Amino acid sequence: MLLIPAIDLKDGRCVRLRQGDLDDVTVFSEDPAAIASNWLAQGARRLHLVDLNGAVAGKPKNEAPIKAILKAVGDDIPVQIGGGIRDLDTIERYLDAGISYVIIGTAAVKNPGFLHDACGAFPGQIIVGLDARDGKIATDGWSKLTRHDVLDLAKKFEDYGCEAIIYTDIGRDGMLSGVNVEATVRLAQHVRIPVYASGGIAGMADIEALCAVEADGVEGAILGRSIYEGALDFKVAQARADELTS
C-alpha cells in the first residue's frame, strides 16, 4: 500500500482546503520545497502535487514552487501533479521538467477526446482524477456537480489506457471525517487499473481499513490534512501499511 503525501499549492505556498473551498484555506508552509524534502526524509515513495490556482485558471500557475520541489527531491522518488492541465503541451512540459505522472481531472470529464489523446501520446504517465460526491462527478475545482456516474466514467477512461485513478470523495476531503472505503472499493472493483483513495483520511484506522481492501485494487492513498496536523505520523503509517500488505 503506497501512501502519498499531498502538497497543495496556492499562491506559492503549501496549503490545505476544506472540501475544495478556495476561501477556506489553512497555510502550512511558505516553503513547499522544504515540505517535499521533509516527506522524502520521512520515507515517502511518491509525492502528489496539486496546483490549486491552476485548477481554477485552467493553466499552470505555481511553476516556481513546482520547479523547486522537483529540484529538492531530484530523481529519488516520482512526483505526480494535477490542477489546470488542459492540453498536451502542458503535459509535455511537466514531463520534460521531471514530473513522472500527470493527473487529468476536469478536462477528462469535459473533453474525453483530450484524455484519449493524452493516454496515447504519453502511455503509462496519465492518471485520471475523479472527484465525486454521492457517486456523481464534480468538476472545475469541485465547484460544479455533474450528472456523470463515477463508475461509468472510470470504466470508459480505463479503456482509454489511463495508468490509474485517484478517487476523491469531496464530501470528506479536508474534514478528517474518515475515508469512504465503501465507495472507493466499489470503484476499484469496477476497473482493473490501480485506484488511489483520497479525501477524509483521518488516522491509522483509515489506513488499516484501506489495507484490508488492497486486494480489491485499492493500491494507495493520498494523505493531506491528517499528516500536516499530526493526526497521522506519516513514517509510522507507511510502516504499518507495509506490514499489513507486504
UniProtKB/Swiss-Prot annotation:
Transmembrane segments: none annotated. GO terms for cellular component: cytoplasm. The keyword Coiled coil does not apply. The keyword Amino-acid biosynthesis applies. The active site is at D8 (proton acceptor), D131 (proton donor). It is an enzyme of class 5 (isomerase). It catalyses: 1-(5-phospho-beta-D-ribosyl)-5-[(5-phospho-beta-D-ribosylamino)methylideneamino]imidazole-4-carboxamide = 5-[(5-phospho-1-deoxy-D-ribulos-1-ylimino)methylamino]-1-(5-phospho-beta-D-ribosyl)imidazole-4-carboxamide. Its EC number is 5.3.1.16. It comes from the Bacteria. It is found in: Cytoplasm. InterPro entries: Aldolase_TIM, His_biosynth, HisA_bact_arch, Isoase_HisA-like, Isoase_HisA-like_bact, RibuloseP-bd_barrel. One of its GO terms (biological process) is L-tryptophan biosynthetic process. Keywords: Amino-acid biosynthesis, Cytoplasm, Histidine biosynthesis, Isomerase. Belongs to the HisA/HisF family. PANTHER family: 1-(5-PHOSPHORIBOSYL)-5-[(5-PHOSPHORIBOSYLAMINO)METHYLIDENEAMINO] IMIDAZOLE-4-CARBOXAMIDE ISOMERASE. This is 1-(5-phosphoribosyl)-5-[(5-phosphoribosylamino)methylideneamino] imidazole-4-carboxamide isomerase. It comes from Bordetella avium (strain 197N).
